[in-house]
Structures are given as C-alpha cells and as structure tokens.
Amino acid sequence: MLAETFPEGNFVVLDEGRPVGMGLGILVEFDFAHTSHALVDITGENGVEHHSIDHPWYYGTDISVYPEYRSRGIGRRLYELRKDCVRRLGKRGIVAGGVIPGYADHIDTMSAQAYIDKVVAGELYDPTLTFQLENGFEARGVIPGYLDDPTVGNNSVLIVWENPDISS
C-alpha cells in the first residue's frame, strides 16, 4: 500500500535484485507542541492512513540496512534520498521517532533524556542516534511509549531535519 500511495518518498536499495536496505515514510501534519506519540498514531492502522501529499512534513516510518551491508554508505544514501524528496516536493523537513538501542546499556543509571543529551554532546555513542546526528538531524527530546521495546523503556527520540530551502 505504501509503495502505491507515496512511491516518490519510499526507497529500496538492491544488490543484484535482493533488497538490502530501505527508507520508508509518509507526508503528515506534525504538532511540535505535542510531540508524544506512538508510530501508529502517525501512520494509522494501514500505514498510510494519515498521509497526504499536501502535508508539510515527511515522517520517516522506517529505515534499515541489512547488517552485512552496513558501513557501505547505504544508510547515508537513504537519508540523502529522503532529503532530496523533501526538497523536490517543497516540504518543511523530516521528522521521525529514532530508536536509541544503546540506551539499553544505560537504562539503570540514567533517564532516556540524560542519555540523549550525552549522545548529542558526544559523551556517549549510540549506533542509531549518532548516525542520525551525523546526517544533519537534531534530537528534540524523548518520545515515551513510542515503540514496544522494554530494553529501552519503550523510549525513542524525536529527530528533526529542517529543509534549509524553506523559511520557517
């Protein structure tokens, strides 16, 4: 359904016909005054329920690269494709709930916000959030209850990339 609804905003990387990475998303309204949400609140039950080409924000619903294909520039290229889509369509930017897998090692010693702050400051490394920061995203706080992952207290981080071609 996603490929038919918003093909210009969804990307699959192939190696000899085999999918090895993907970046998926939809266009949404996003209320920055009320950022707490679960992914299904954004996508709806069918994954595209709240998508409209008229909405101003690209919401990154999923991005992944098979482990054996990591560190080859595929993830960076997927983010570039998303940014290119946003620029081409004249959208405000990209919003997503970013997973913070490294928080599992610190959950007993600090809050999710403290962990995010330390990653942003460069004091801790998170395999996902650090990569997102290196790709121009800002961390804008914790999203509690975003996903069902007790190892990180069901927390995620709100990440935002603002299109520099669009004035606020």
Predicted feature locations:
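Conserved acyl-donor/pantetheine-binding loop and adjacent beta-alpha core of acyl/acetyltransferases
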Residues: 23-62, 80, 100-133, 138, ...
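Conserved beta-hairpin
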Residues: 9-23, 38-39
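Short beta-strand micro-motifs in enzyme catalytic cores
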Residues: 9-11, 56, 153-159
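Short loop/turn motifs at secondary-structure junctions and domain boundaries
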Residues: 2-6
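Short loop segments at secondary-structure junctions
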Residues: 16-18, 28, 68-69, 162-166
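Conserved acetyl-CoA-binding loop-helix of GNAT-fold acetyltransferases
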Residues: 65, 71-87, 95-96
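C-terminal/domain-terminus segments
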Residues: 76-85, 140-168
